[in-house]
Design a protein with these regions (language model features):
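Polysaccharide-binding and catalytic clefts of secreted carbohydrate-active enzymes
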Residues: 110-273, 277-293
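The substrate-binding groove and active-site-proximal loops of carbohydrate-active enzymes
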Residues: 18-29, 51-68, 115-134, 156-163, ...
Length: 686
């Protein structure tokens, strides 16, 4: 990584919280641009991303540069007090590149070329594409490094392309050679003795193209790793060019939360600022919860330092099957959710709604109907709110609870040859996150290799693939006094996706005090019982488990079918810590009981005096508690102390009412007073 001085602090020290949008002036006549600046100022916008999709305008023919329009735009923005996140336009190559050099175009697993006429039409392994991308990036960096408007750089856009062409096959072989050194090493890692798949020459090795039946899962896993590395190398190449000309401004690229196509833990180590896209689905009442989880991933990716919500929607999008607009007030509370969970800025796609192109129906800061609209008024009101909250800029956002997540494990777990395709990783992640979110507890989503010592409780909802190194780290964490909850179908495979011989969960069996002999995808739901109290049913998954340690105890058992009386949840003590293994897809009530037991054992108090209503979110940052109502109904909340709302100055008692789609930002009591309040709260009252 580059020095920590390359961070959002260089922007927020001057502007407070960042507020902005993607600005695409090339879609509009130049006469519109001064009016755009006026509207930005009226809305309180202080940062815009420029140039994301402008390659064809910047380089209309190979080697020809057209910078006049961009010179004027940057000068206008600077004169208007608007800072710029200048993008390299390499996400959408011009038609001439694909026409003259078809090898730059991606090829799908069926061998079909994906043509220009859309966006993202590039092959990450194409040498010609990389050459052209480097050339336009260097031209931009050389010309605009030091321009007073440019405060940050944005590489490409939503890097996620994949190709299966011959040039990619060559690059894949090089990646495999560096990983395994020899064909013998590759054949062992891929288990090619199965189905007569052994390779006798590197020229025979291909990406996992369309095949008659299931493709080798180890080959597929390595290709996903390779593709992620190729995308990261694209980012690095452009970043390093920019750095030659601008050593001061932060460089980033926009991530997409839980996007399956790239390992964002690897990306986060290379970016100066973690920047993420998040688009709430107004039609889904639980979308805000997944949004919170995504923000907590950003909190983990950034190590608790501020991050940036670089894309979101003011209202409806255009790419879902049914694009419901946001209700009045939703724009504001969605932004607050990100700020509460560590974001130092909120930006929208895009500034002006397009009249043409594939995203013409996507909402924007300025709708086609103009400034005298609900959406623009709400944006301007949010701009004022963010100025009121400017004291939160730069404040850290850390947690005592970690949720473990690993892209390698995700890729491996959802191979089509597993016992079920219904036990999806993100579903498991959300299920374990839900009781923490509903209690207002702060969470960081981190990699299994993270320093876990700063967390009192660690949840691992799904770690299908777990290396011995990471398993040893979890063991050391528990023995040292940590508390660990492990979800089903974990510690099943090694780094190559090979299953371990013996009883599962393999490298965690001794730590967890339990092992199993058979996975049991369920033909019918089976009950889960805590003591004598039924707690719902597992519907997808169960495991045939047995205790293997005198320190292990059965917390819950199965209540029916062939697994009647067998352990469903096991708790074990190892050293100074405790672990829980969950051998089923527990229903919400049962999982809530397991998490509550772990919280109590870890000494983590509930932050509020009473449980939160279902559609209310609570999160703390910078000594302030954000209370956010994601429903269209008033909601009663009981923080347990009297306080003042930072947004309005209004006083509130120990119990309060949140208006529909409303929010409060309450000053929290002094740390010791707050700690005393929390320590008196029990599970029954929280």
């Amino acid at each position: 990584m580059y020095p920590s001085s390359h961070s959002l602090t260089s922007l927020t020290d001057r502007s407070g919280l960042l507020f902005g949008a993607d600005y695409n002036p090339e879609q509009w006549p130049a006469e519109t641009w001064p009016e755009d600046i006026r509207l930005m100022q009226e809305a309180g916008i202080n940062l815009v991303t420029v140039g994301v999709f402008s390659w064809a305008l910047l380089e209309p023919r190979e080697g020809t540069r057209n910078f006049g329009w961009l010179d004027r735009v940057l000068d206008l923005l600077h004169d208007g007090g608007i800072r710029v996140c200048l993008a390299t336009p390499t996400a959408s190559p011009p038609a001439w590149l694909g026409h003259e050099y078809p090898e730059t175009l991606p090829v799908d697993a069926d061998g079909r070329t994906l043509w220009y006429g859309s966006r993202n039409q590039f092959n990450p392994s194409s040498a010609k594409y990389r050459q052209a991308a480097a050339a336009i990036t260097e031209s931009l960096a050389k010309r605009y490094a030091g321009h007073p408007a440019v405060a940050m750089w944005h590489v490409g856009n939503e890097l996620g392309q994949v190709s299966y062409d011959d040039e990619t096959a060559l690059a894949f072989r090089g990646w495999l050679t560096r990983r395994y050194a020899t064909l013998e090493g590759l054949n062992r890692a891929w288990g090619t003795s199965f189905w007569s798949q052994g390779y006798g020459s590197w020229d025979e090795v291909l990406p996992p193209r369309r095949a008659p039946y299931l493709v080798n899962p180890s080959q597929t896993l390595d290709f996903q790793r390779f593709t992620s590395d190729q995308l990261l190398s694209l980012y690095r190449a452009e970043r390093d060019i920019i750095r030659r000309y601008d050593t001061a401004s932060p460089v980033t690229t926009n991530l997409m939360g839980f996007f399956r196509g790239a390992d964002y833990f690897a990306f986060a180590r290379e970016t100066d600022v973690v920047a993420n896209d998040w688009y709430t689905d107004p039609a889904d009442p639980d979308s805000h919860r997944f949004g919170s989880l995504t923000h907590d991933l950003c909190r983990g990716l950034s190590g608790g330092t501020p991050w940036l919500l670089i894309e979101s929607a003011t209202s409806g999008v255009n790419w879902r099957e049914h694009n419901v607009p946001k209700q009045p007030g939703e724009l504001r509370i969605d932004a607050f959710s990100a700020i509460a969970r560590g974001a130092d800025g909120v930006c929208f796609f895009q500034f002006r709604q397009s009249r043409f192109g594939a995203e013409r129906f996507h909402s924007a800061v300025v709708p086609l109907a103009g400034e005298h609209t609900r959406v623009f008024r709400e944006v301007a009101d949010l701009g004022k709110d963010l100025q009121t909250l400017r004291q939160l800029a730069g404040t850290p956002s850390t947690a005592r609870i970690a949720v473990l997540f690993d892209w390698d494990s995700w890729w491996a777990a959802e191979s089509p040859d597993t016992p079920t395709n219904r036990l999806e990783v993100l579903d498991q992640l959300q299920a374990y996150y839900a009781p923490l979110h509903s209690s207002g507890l702060a969470v960081e989503v981190v990699h299994p290799s993270a320093d876990l010592g700063r967390f009192a409780l660690v949840l691992a909802p799904s770690l299908f693939l777990l290396s011995k190194e990471h398993a040893d780290g979890l063991g050391a964490y528990v023995r040292g006094g940590g508390h660990l909850v492990v979800g089903p179908f974990s510690a099943v495979a090694d780094d190559n996706g090979h299953l371990a011989p013996g009883r599962f969960p393999c490298v965690l069996a001794d730590l967890l005090g339990v092992d199993g002999e058979e996975w049991v995808p369920l033909a019918a739901p089976v009950g889960v019982v805590f003591g004598d109290a039924p707690a719902g049913q597992a519907r997808i998954w169960a495991e045939d488990l047995a205790l293997n340690s005198g320190t292990a105890e059965v917390v819950a058992h199965f209540g029916g079918g062939r697994l009647e009386g067998r352990p469903a949840v096991v708790r074990n003590q190892t050293g100074a810590g405790h672990s829980w293994y969950v051998g089923a897809d527990l229903p919400p009530l049962a999982l809530e009981q397991v998490v509550a037991d772990a919280l109590e054992s870890a000494g983590i108090a509930y932050p509020l005096a009473a449980p939160l209503p279902d559609q209310v979110e609570a999160a703390s940052r910078g000594g302030h508690l954000f209370l956010i109502n994601h429903s269209g109904q008033p909601q009663e909340v009981e923080p347990g102390w009297a306080s003042v709302d930072l947004l309005t100055g209004g006083a509130h008692g120990e119990r309060l009412t949140l208006p529909p789609f409303g929010a409060l930002v309450l000053k929290e009591p002094a740390p010791q007073e707050l700690s005393n309040l929390k320590n008196h709260r029990t599970r029954g009252t929280a």
